[in-house]
Amino acid sequence: MTDGTPMDRDATQLYCPNSSCQAPNAERSKFCQRCRTLLPKRYLWAIEPGKLSAEMPEILDDRYILKYDRVYLDTHPGILPHVPEQVPPEIRAYLRLFPHRWHIPQIYGSASDSASDSELDAPSIWLLENAPIEPRANGTWRQFPHIDLAWSQVDDLHKLGWLWQILNLWTDCVREGVASTLLDSQQVRVDGSFIRIAQLIPDESELSPGLDKLGYLWSRWIPTTKPPLRDFFEQFCQYMIDGQLHTPEQAQMVIDRAIDRLNVTRNYHWQVTTLSDRGPSRTRNEDACFPLTEKPDPPRSQVLGIVCDGVGGHDGGDIASGLAISTVSDRVSRIEPSPKSSLAKWSRVDKLDRVREAIAEANDAIGQRNNDEQRQGRQRMGTTIVIGQGDNNDLFISHIGDSRAYLVNTRSFYSLTVDDDVASREVRLGYAFYRTAVHQPAAGSLVQALGMGASSHLYPTTQRFIVNEDCIVLLCSDGLSDYDRVEQHWKTELQPILDHTTSLTSAAHRLVEIANTQNGHDNVTVALMQLRVTPNSNHTVDSTELLACLTPLPSAPAPQDNHATVATEVSTTITPNRRSLLMPALAIGIPLTILAGFFLPPVIEQFANRNNLALESARDLPVPPPENDTAEIQLEDRIAIEPPNAATTTTETSEPLMVGQQLVVRRPLVVYPNKIETSPPLDGAIKSGAIVEVKAIDKTIDRHWLQLRSCPQDIASGGRECGLTADRNTSHRPCRSCQHCRDTH
């Protein structure tokens, strides 16, 4: 690791985040010396898009203190970081790649040189959190090693796992114009089993690099690769360079064959324990878990853990979570383990498909129960779910809602899931910064949960991780994860399991105790899964066996959801969360029909061009049917929409717009009263971030017109904006008439 000496920690003052205290404390202090509030220490990595200064300012914005090189400490963690109102294009990729946050650092905020006389003299500096840096207890710093340095120091399974992860990032990085990041080995850092990106590097050319460029880069590591992997790796790189392996999915399948061969040289020991508690403030426990055991079974190569959280405040949340547990556990428990031989039938994609089917079955079972009991509105049962499957060195995580999964190894902590809520959706779309998005109204409201809509509109996130070292996986409901309790306590409560100073059962009890004493507002459920990896000296693998993994080459499959869905524009009737049990005004539950005209060239395929137009395809989005008490508002005015850029043309291939397609508005669009060119625009506009549905397509001589259906709140008007709020015990009808804020609720 790269070492460095930071500034004097005793000289740095860290201000208490408690708004009623804000006392200064020494950086070394864990708790505020006045009020005993935990002091979060956020060490951030500074970047300057487009330039790299030789020296960084010692203080930024009178709050960020330079500790070493480009590492800053936020001395006012209780104050929201500054961010611009509009997301600059050069850092949007960080937001849209938010679901890959265990690999890619995220934007914390922006800052400027505090010593500068003018902001114009101080170009924006962006501060990244979750960067591959780590403070040491003795005050020195280390940066995780880049892959060039680490390659020769790890075993073959680690090497193959790193390659698989880079391929897993490739497609999304290409789409966001940052594939060059993966071609710069200085930006590709490693932490045990995991790839960590230092910062994103934009592509210089509009033409995305091909997979052959990865092959050229990786071939530099052939001389430091030892048998039995060397011959396989050399041929694998050549196939990438020659184009015989031309898709990431195809290359991943070959790597998986080699991983399965090498897995016989390891023993994987999984154990799981669960614990659920009603909590101090609830009359019943709406959480559920699987398996129902505090004492772990003997270690084995495959385990299953599930946590469900009945949507708080809904009658029958405990029934919904119980139905989900019984349905999913029964279906998933019957899935066969992954093969340990490359000659066995490929099964990982099948495994993920089976999990999705199990989630759909659970959703249907809860929905049918709701219908049989004629439950409407708040009476309808719903639940979140998070599923963890350990299978040799494969970890499969699937989830719906805001129940979470975390992974802890001997060095680091990873949040593996992204909540299905409004705040995360805005970040994934590139519209908001996470630190500020979570403080917006209805930010924590769920956009999907089991039992709240048809399975055809349910989009579970299913992911696969390759873990080749001892680790702990935590699944939990938000009774524990709220207020960053896991982030605060993972070192003291979870890492000791790995050095055998505490047990799974004891750790589970401690986590429940923390949830009840430091949160206490909800039920709490945890499932702890432990993996221990030991060598298997009874088996060896030679070069010939690994070379056989290249014959025959697999055909290029359709891309699979083996990773997080990135920038998925979730458009749905929003499910209330525990903090706000209403259908928020952000939802599209109340449709508004308008006619939209784009001043476009007569090539309708260009409507959906992601790079240039204001409408972004949202065809993959879940759009549950509106509730029975919603009503469609028909406007008699015919409204056209001004184009975002009439001069824009494109040669990219895009799918034509179709009736029923959902689109995301990329920039605010001006609306007109009719299709007559001389008509002045109306006061209202469709806001950036609005999600609309194509109801009809009409063509005139020089324009295309769209009839769109949109949420009333997405029409900005001369009156005030409709924004319903409620506490957890309140239920409101969504706004029925917002065109000019007539406040009919």
Language model feature labels by segment:
Residues 19-21, 35:
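Short Cys/His-rich metal-coordination motifs, predominantly Zn2+-binding knuckles/fingers
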Residues 2-8:
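Non-catalytic signal-transmission and effector/linker regions of two-component phosphorelay proteins
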Residues 22, 46-53:
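N-terminal sensory and localization modules of signal-transduction and trafficking proteins
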Residues 6, 13, 27-39, 66, ...:
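PP2C/PPM-type serine/threonine phosphatase catalytic domain
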Residues 483, 672-675, 701-707:
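Short, Lys/Arg- and Gly-enriched loop/turn segments at beta-strand edges
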Residues 640, 682-736:
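SH3/SH3-like beta-barrel superfamily modules
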Residues 208, 212, 221-222:
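Long, charge-rich alpha-helical interaction segments
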